């Protein structure tokens, strides 16, 4: 934390329901381990927990068609799409043709179907050059899942309401999709690292105080690998997801923070993510409290399918969490960057650095949340360094 370019950062780890690591650091006193930070796509794993709770109640299965619960979704040829395909990023809805108004994302407006109407009239699009149908739904998956969730949930709640009432309050954590007015002051705003800084700092050798994880040549190689992937995507050239968005700092806007974008705009902290992850690593239970029953937990982690998603090959379960597995001699460099150091973990990570993952075999709950966003570190290898060290510690403990 002291050697890399960090403004404020948090790291928390649970092992067998016990908090064993609780670190945070900042350049000023305005930051604390309980500060709220946008964890971006780490929120995707929270939306999977919400949906799994419906499976546990016998209200849906992942093999069901979305139109079983939301008939209007079938417009424009989407009638056969299953919940599992949506959760595995295979819905063909990775980006929308228009930008959404942040006011439409407020909980009360979601319940008026402001977002649902847009999704209903949207057509599916898959990569122009064919191949795998899996394409990362960076922002859109959460909007669609929220519409499915609220139509099935007995009280008609949104994901944001479920997380507050069924996860946040009983577990004593912050799992916030839709920040309330009185919570805005708790936020620590995200700060993207400028590309100029990234470029010049990467030219330094480590012994001269380089504050980036990778040197210039490593960064250049990673960027060059991603260019053809980006160009062969359905998101290339599409509008920004939000009206008025001019860059990543737009995520600091209160109007956006107060709306529900579960896949890209969840506010939490490392302590909370690690505790939720500890619950998930223990089969959906924490200190005798059950948050997901066995049927829900098992279904969420079942039916893993490997496919190319642009950033190398990924394994996603039917419930929508990634499973990180050991690599072999034939694995690509991207596959190794994605998996090595995370073997056995489930979950996901967020733009610029955050990680929210759990390891059922070793019963590890892991949460890492920085405010300094390294947008070039696409696979969150900065935080993976801590994950690898946690695995090393567990290995030494079990010898």
Named regions from a protein language model:
Residues 89, 141-148, 264-286, 354-371:
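Active-site-proximal alpha-helical segments within enzyme catalytic domains
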Residues 193-270, 298, 302-361:
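Active-site Gly/Thr loop motif
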């Amino acid at each position: 934390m002291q050697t890399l370019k960090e403004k404020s950062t948090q790291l928390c780890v649970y092992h067998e329901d016990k908090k064993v690591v609780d670190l945070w650091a900042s350049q000023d006193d305005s930051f604390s381990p309980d500060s709220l930070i946008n964890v971006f796509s780490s929120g995707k794993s929270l939306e999977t927990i919400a949906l799994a709770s419906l499976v546990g109640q016998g209200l849906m299965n992942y093999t069901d068609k979305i139109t079983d619960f939301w008939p209007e979704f079938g417009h424009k040829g989407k009638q056969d799409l299953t919940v599992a395909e949506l959760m595995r990023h295979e819905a063909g809805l990775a980006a929308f043709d228009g930008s959404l108004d942040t006011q439409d994302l407020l909980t009360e407006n979601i319940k008026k179907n402001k977002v649902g109407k847009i999704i209903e009239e949207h057509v599916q699009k898959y990569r122009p050059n064919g191949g795998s149908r899996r394409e990362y739904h960076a922002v859109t998956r959460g909007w669609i899942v929220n519409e499915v969730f609220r139509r099935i949930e007995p009280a008609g709640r949104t994901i944001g309401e479920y997380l507050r009432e069924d996860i946040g309050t009983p577990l004593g954590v912050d799992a916030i999709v839709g920040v309330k007015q009185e919570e805005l002051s708790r936020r620590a705003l995200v700060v993207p690292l400028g590309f100029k800084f990234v470029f010049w700092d990467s030219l330094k050798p480590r012994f001269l105080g380089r504050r980036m994880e990778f040197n210039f040549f490593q960064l250049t190689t990673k960027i060059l690998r991603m260019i053809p992937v980006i160009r062969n995507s359905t998101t290339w050239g599409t509008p920004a997801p939000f009206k008025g968005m001019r860059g990543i700092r737009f995520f600091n806007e209160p109007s956006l923070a107060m709306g529900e974008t579960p896949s890209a705009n969840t506010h939490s902290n490392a302590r909370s993510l690690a505790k939720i992850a500890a619950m998930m690593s223990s089969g959906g239970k924490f200190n005798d409290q059950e948050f997901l029953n066995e049927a829900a937990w098992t279904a969420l982690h079942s039916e893993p399918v490997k496919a190319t998603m642009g950033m190398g090959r990924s394994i996603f379960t039917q419930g929508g969490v990634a499973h990180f597995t050991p690599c072999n001699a034939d694995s690509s460099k991207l596959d190794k960057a994605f998996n090595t150091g995370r073997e056995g973990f489930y979950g996901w990570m967020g733009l610029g650095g955050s990680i929210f993952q759990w390891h059922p075999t070793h019963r590890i709950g892991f949460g890492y949340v920085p405010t300094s966003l390294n947008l070039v570190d696409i696979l969150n290898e900065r935080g993976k360094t801590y994950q690898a060290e946690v695995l090393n510690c567990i290995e030494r403990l079990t010898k």
